[in-house]
Regions:
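Short amphipathic alpha-helix that is part of the acyltransferase structural core
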Residues: 1-39, 47-61, 152-176
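Conserved acidic functional residues
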Residues: 13, 118-119
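Conserved active-site tyrosine of GNAT-family acetyltransferases
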Residues: 123, 128
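Conserved catalytic-core motifs of GNAT/GCN5-like acyltransferases
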Residues: 117, 129-151
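Short, solvent-exposed loop/turn elements at beta->coil junctions and helix N-caps
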Residues: 38-44, 134-136
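Conserved acetyl-CoA pyrophosphate-binding loop and the N-cap/start of the following alpha-helix
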Residues: 89-101, 111
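Conserved GNAT acetyl-CoA-binding A-motif
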Residues: 104-118, 131
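Conserved beta-strand in the GNAT
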Residues: 52-54, 60-70, 76-84
Length: 176
C-alpha cells in the first residue's frame, strides 16, 4: 500500500540539515545544477529560513524546499527553489504539500509576492502564472518565470540582494 503525506513530519530546515538537503538536491537534479541562473541569485545570500522546509518520514528526509530573498523593481520577492522529493516518495503529493505550505507561511510572515522558475502546468495548480516583464538572469526561458501574489505593475530584472534588504520577518540561518 502507498504512503500518504499524512505520515510525513514537516519541519523548518536548520543549519545542521544543510548537507543532507544538498545531498537530496544532488540526487534529484542533474549535475551542474549550481550553474543555473537562480543559483547566481542565491550566492552568498542567506535563505528565508522560515520558508525552508523539510519533510521527513520516520526521521528520513523525503523532501525539501528552500526560499531565497530577491528584488524586482526595488520590491522584495521570495524566490522558491529548489524543491525536491526523494525518488521513493515521488507521486505521493509531497511536493505539492511543500509548495502549499510555503505559500501559506510566506503570506503569514508578510511576503507579498513569490516567484519560481518551473513548469507552468504543474505550478499553475497552486495559482502561479507567467510573469510577463519579469526577467531572470539568462539563460532562463521566460515562459518558465512564474509568480503568485501582488505583481500588479511590477516588472524588471530579478536582482540578488543582501540579507539587510529583505523584509523584517526574514531571519536567514547561517551556513558556516
Amino acid at each position: 500500500m502507498g504512503r500518504t503525506v499524512q505520515e510525513v513530519n514537516l519541519t523548518q530546515e536548520q543549519a545542521a540539515d544543510w548537507w543532507e538537503v544538498e545531498a537530496l538536491f544532488d540526487l534529484c537534479f542533474a549535475p551542474g545544477r549550481e550553474a543555473l541562473s537562480s543559483y547566481r541569485l542565491r550566492d552568498g545570500v542567506a535563505p528565508v529560513s522560515q520558508l525552508c522546509l523539510l519533510a521527513r518520514e520516520n526521521g528520513i528526509l523525503a523532501g525539501a524546499i528552500r526560499v531565497w530573498p530577491v528584488r524586482v523593481a526595488g520590491r522584495p520577492v521570495a524566490l522558491i527553489g529548489p524543491v525536491a522529493v526523494h525518488p521513493t516518495h515521488q507521486g505521493e503529493g509531497l511536493g505539492g504539500m511543500l509548495i502549499r505550505e510555503v505559500i501559506d507561511r510566506a503570506h503569514h510572515i508578510g511576503w507579498e509576492r513569490l516567484m519560481l522558475v518551473g513548469d507552468a502546468p504543474y505550478y499553475g495548480r497552486f495559482g502561479f502564472t507567467r510573469l510577463d516583464g519579469v526577467e531572470m538572469p539568462p539563460p532562463t526561458n521566460p515562459d518558465r518565470v512564474l509568480g503568485i501574489g501582488d505583481w500588479d505593475g511590477i516588472s524588471g530584472k530579478v536582482l540578488r540582494v543582501a540579507g539587510a534588504n529583505t523584509p523584517p520577518a526574514h531571519q536567514g540561518f547561517k551556513l558556516s
